[in-house]
């Protein structure tokens, strides 16, 4: 049984760490089920990333696997988990999905992708490093907040948020107004997870376009990688960071590096409309586009952006976030520290 355990559930670098457990198992008569139970209980083998994707239904859906009742936003929702959902543009899917789209989390950050033409990335920051969405469902109640759970930290409104893929019309960023949209969980292991969105019948630059955008989050990381795929080159694709607050924010920078372009912002704003229960959050946003995919930097009143330059109809970039007031031990407490951190982060990427 120990050979099965070490081969299937403990990677080679971890075997030395688990040698005491393996010696114990060799002397035992444990079944495979018992061995699996021990391994699951081991913290280093437990999942360190997770996804969250819920369809809002009715009590009749209680027969579905994973069905649960979620109390959020002042409502009681009968929900069941999904891995994929597709709808046409005339369906208000945004309000038919709990937390309005698919989400992914590591111990440090969680990100959700809105299921509408915005396709904006929104941010949930962890106060304590841990997986939380299986308990908070993005909207932690008072008792969870008292236990040290994180929360949403960014009001994205109609902006690019951080690392969303938008279209530059020559004067400002606009949303992806496609005929059909599909969100999905592409992949999930203990140490990484990928979520994505595809659009079809997107009328842009004189043609009907299809596009897929995937975000991958790794265990122990606050940053994500974004991969973009199109059927034909699209000159106006862009990404970037919003100003904070979305209206009136000004602390943004664009830095041309030898290996690409770094976009960043820093600021303070209320993350939600309830300004009585929730306080303002100070947040840092960053996006890095490798040189091969970095086009011309552009901006409008609410967004610091860069055009994406595709190679063989693909491009990729990276995004990251700091919750200066939310995290117990933030990596930056002011704009200068944040920009210094981003410079070191970006230099390692390609």
How does the language model describe each region?
Residues 234, 244-302:
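Accessory, usually C-terminal, subdomains that scaffold auxiliary metal cofactors
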Residues 150-219:
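Extended, loop-rich substrate-binding clefts of extracytoplasmic carbohydrate-active enzymes
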Residues 84-85, 91, 283-350:
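Beta-strand-rich recognition/accessory modules
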Residues 184-191, 219, 230-236, 309-315:
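A short, structured loop/turn motif at beta-sheet edges
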Residues 1-2, 12-50:
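Bacterial Sec-dependent N-terminal signal peptides
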Residues 49-175:
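Solvent-exposed N-terminal domain segments of exported/luminal and surface proteins
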Residues 211, 222-255:
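Acidic (Asp/Glu-rich), glycine- and aromatic
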Residues 196-198, 214-216, 227-229, 240-242, ...:
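Residue-level recognition of well-ordered beta-strand positions that form the cores
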């Amino acid at each position: 049984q120990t050979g099965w355990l070490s081969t299937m559930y403990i990677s080679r670098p971890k075997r030395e760490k688990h040698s005491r457990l393996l010696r114990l198992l060799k002397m035992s008569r444990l079944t495979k089920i018992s061995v699996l139970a021990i391994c699951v209980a081991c913290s280093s083998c437990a999942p360190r990333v997770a996804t969250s994707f819920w369809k809002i239904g009715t009590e009749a859906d209680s027969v579905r696997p994973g069905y649960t009742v979620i109390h959020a936003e002042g409502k009681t929702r009968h929900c069941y988990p999904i891995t994929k959902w597709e709808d046409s543009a005339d369906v208000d899917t945004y309000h038919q999905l709990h937390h309005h789209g698919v989400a992914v989390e590591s111990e440090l950050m969680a990100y959700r992708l809105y299921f509408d033409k915005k396709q904006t990335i929104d941010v949930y920051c962890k106060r304590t490093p841990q997986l939380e969405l299986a308990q908070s469902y993005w909207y932690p109640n008072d008792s969870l907040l008292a236990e040290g759970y994180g929360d949403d930290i960014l009001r994205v409104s109609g902006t690019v948020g951080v690392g969303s893929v938008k279209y530059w019309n020559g004067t400002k960023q606009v949303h992806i107004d496609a005929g059909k949209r599909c969100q999905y969980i592409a992949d999930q292991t203990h140490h990484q997870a990928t979520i994505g969105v595809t659009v079809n019948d997107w009328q842009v630059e004189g043609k009907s376009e299809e596009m897929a955008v995937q975000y991958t989050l790794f265990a122990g990381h606050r940053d994500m990688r974004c991969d973009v795929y199109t059927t034909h080159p699209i000159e106006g694709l862009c990404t970037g960071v919003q100003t904070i607050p979305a209206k009136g924010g000004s602390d943004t920078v664009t830095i041309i590096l030898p290996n690409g372009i770094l976009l960043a912002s820093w600021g303070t704003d209320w993350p939600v409309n309830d300004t009585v229960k929730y306080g303002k959050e100070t947040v840092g946003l960053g996006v890095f586009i490798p040189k091969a995919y970095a086009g011309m930097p552009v901006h409008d009143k609410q967004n610091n952006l860069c055009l994406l330059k595709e190679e063989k109809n693909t491009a990729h970039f990276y995004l990251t976030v700091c919750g200066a007031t939310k995290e117990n031990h933030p990596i930056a407490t002011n704009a200068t520290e944040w920009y210094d951190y981003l410079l070191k982060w970006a230099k390692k990427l390609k």
